[in-house]
A protein has these predicted regions:
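Histidine-/acidic-rich catalytic cores in large beta-rich domains
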Residues: 1-173
Length: 173
């Protein structure tokens, strides 16, 4: 993890759990195959630099399309009494898919934000091509809201979300 630019002080005894999304196609009578995947690890920035998945980690932590791997919201003091909090960095606990936009919304209570990512990188004729596309710039954050301090664009007073849970797309109208 430290090689990915995470400050060693922010790594818990269980390592660092970086969130992922897997889309599975059932294979009958049992099992499934991965047809698309997205990993937050492919979309990080760190002021410390580093290497993640064989690629240099961008150092511009103010880029809103990237996750600052060293951002921790210290307002969750009760969580910091639990060493596992450092491991569960984002604590993504909700996901919703919008088929009209082909976009996915996820939330991160530990960072105090929600994110929109592009699912149109999926390629069901060639799943690996879609997985590769999601790992590149096409898989970066399209939109984020809730805590501009997490990417250096605001102060604590600008934060709008606090340890939110559950995200849903709102139907037009």
């Amino acid at each position: 993890t430290v090689h990915g630019g995470r400050d060693p002080e922010g790594v818990g005894p269980e390592g660092l759990w970086v969130d992922s999304i897997l889309e599975l196609k059932p294979t009958r009578p049992e099992g499934a195959e991965i047809v698309w995947e997205w990993h937050a690890w492919d979309h990080i920035a760190s002021e410390l630099g580093g290497i993640a998945n064989g690629k240099p980690v961008p150092t511009d932590i103010t880029n809103p399309k990237k996750f600052n791997i060293n951002y921790i919201d210290l307002n969750h003091t009760s969580n910091f009494q639990n060493p596992d909090f450092y491991s569960d960095w984002m604590h993504t606990n909700a996901i919703d898919y919008n088929p009209k936009l082909d976009q996915i919304a996820i939330d991160s209570p530990n960072i105090g934000e929600f994110y929109i990512i592009d699912h149109s990188t999926a390629n069901y004729d060639d799943p690996q091509a879609g997985i590769d596309a999601a790992a590149g710039p096409a898989g970066d954050i399209l939109y984020r809201w809730g805590n501009p301090k997490a990417y250096g664009a605001g102060e604590k007073a600008d934060q709008k979300l606090y340890f939110e849970h559950d995200i849903h797309w709102i139907e037009p109208g």
